[in-house]
């Protein structure tokens, strides 16, 4: 009885170790950025509109030249259906928001409301954008 418990615990520990360390080993393969989705509002009240207008400037400054091809801009005010796909899938609650996605649509990074040029540029560099 004691021996079988030890075997079970040893097997369980081995399985847990593989589960814990396998993602760390795989994390050396950094996912590649395929698309950046920017969800904003052109019609909103007060501070929401101000945040979105500021976000528009930041996104415009960061996504220029070759980087512009990565960006998909979705305006909730004029294209609710397209925005709702992302809102539902990624459980978004604030605007403006940037979504960094890989080729399979997996979320790599997100940033909402207070968009910062340096932080976004750093994340672009990290994911190869």
What are these regions (language model features)?
Residues 2-10:
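N-terminal Sec-pathway targeting helices
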Residues 9-21:
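Hydrophobic membrane-insertion alpha-helices, especially the h-region
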Residues 18-30:
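Bacterial Sec-dependent signal peptides at the C-terminal "C-region" and cleavage site
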Residues 28-65:
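Local sequence-structure signature of Cys/Sec-based thiol-disulfide redox active-site neighborhoods
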